[in-house]
């Protein structure tokens, strides 16, 4: 419910939440980000036992600075598809927030639908991405279109034009 209200505060609805979470069909997470899912709890019905054991085995021991990672989608980690939702139904969601989609009555129906109908997932994902891409657009000097999203573009001075090169007759 916290995610539902967080999304609602940004004018995004439950369909947006469930479909945009499907982006977790790609990518990895560092072990510390999901250690709450793989902790040594005797029986945690919120996670598949074998999956929890595999996560625990992978992330325990020598893990300097949390460098070990786990793929977010255990079935098809390098394909954009609806198998992420199968992971959730099988109780193999890496994050609590992901697994919560199949456990919460408001989101369960849509997550299940996306597991059964990849086309419906793709259509809603496209609508939700478009909706999200139009939110809080920064223009002018407040924003920039980056060449590399992780690195701010180099700032260029525009206060005065560059001086002409020697021999240039402007």
From Swiss-Prot:
Ca(2+) binds at residues 25, 73, 76, 81. Binds 2 calcium ions per subunit. Binds 1 heme b (iron(II)-protoporphyrin IX) group per subunit. Disulfide bonds join 31-59. Heme b binds at residue 24. InterPro entries: Haem_peroxidase, Haem_peroxidase_sf, Peroxidase_pln, Peroxidases_heam-ligand_BS. Glycans are attached at residue 9. It holds the Pfam family peroxidase. Keywords: Calcium, Disulfide bond, Glycoprotein, Heme, Hydrogen peroxide, Iron, Metal-binding, Oxidoreductase, Peroxidase. GO terms for biological process: hydrogen peroxide catabolic process; response to oxidative stress. It catalyses: 2 a phenolic donor + H2O2 = 2 a phenolic radical donor + 2 H2O. Its cofactor is Ca(2+); heme b. One of its GO terms (molecular function) is heme binding. Its EC number is 1.11.1.7. Belongs to the peroxidase family. Classical plant (class III) peroxidase subfamily. Removal of H(2)O(2), oxidation of toxic reductants, biosynthesis and degradation of lignin, suberization, auxin catabolism, response to environmental stresses such as wounding, pathogen attack and oxidative stress. These functions might be dependent on each isozyme/isoform in each plant tissue. This is Peroxidase 2. It comes from Hordeum vulgare.
